[in-house]
Design a protein with these regions (language model features):
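Catalytic core and acceptor-binding pocket of nucleotide-sugar-dependent glycosyltransferases
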Residues: 27-134
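Conserved donor-nucleotide/metal-binding helix-loop-beta segment in metal-dependent transferases, i.e.
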Residues: 1-28
Length: 134
């Protein structure tokens, strides 16, 4: 885990069948899961990554999860679906990622996301504006 250790097993149980999950900031065609601010990686995913000497200046989530997506699938890396990954962590608002409102009508709260860059803001109005920005 590359960020604060999860404090609740309820989150880990939701995601444990996937080797890597998180939302890539751009809408990619093959895979939209990357490192949007917080990511968990299985041992299998780390072993897959270790075959590469470096990322050649490409951000690691793009390098491993987009550019080498097909190779990862050959190594049986299991990426979480976008909808589940978004609930785990996101770097951008759902609207910005999908051009539509979230499926859930519930307002943003810290229980809905396990990790998110927006948590660095203390002002909840600022959070809401970032979460649902155009």
């Amino acid at each position: 885990i590359g960020a604060p250790w999860p404090s609740s097993r309820k989150w880990l149980n939701r995601f444990k069948k996937y080797d890597y999950y998180n939302v890539v900031k751009n809408n990619m065609q093959k895979n939209r899961i990357g490192n949007g601010g917080f990511s968990l990686r299985s041992r299998k995913f780390l072993e897959f990554c270790s075959q590469f000497e470096n990322c050649n200046g490409v951000p690691e989530d793009i390098f491993f999860c987009i550019l080498n997506y097909e190779e990862a699938k050959k190594h049986k890396i299991n990426f979480a679906p976008f909808e589940l990954a978004y609930k785990f962590s996101s770097e951008h608002s759902f609207r910005k990622l999908t051009n539509k409102h979230p499926v859930s009508k519930s307002k943003f709260n810290f229980q809905n996301h396990f990790g998110w860059h927006g948590k660095r803001f203390l002002n909840s109005d600022k959070l809401m504006n970032l979460k649902y920005e155009n």
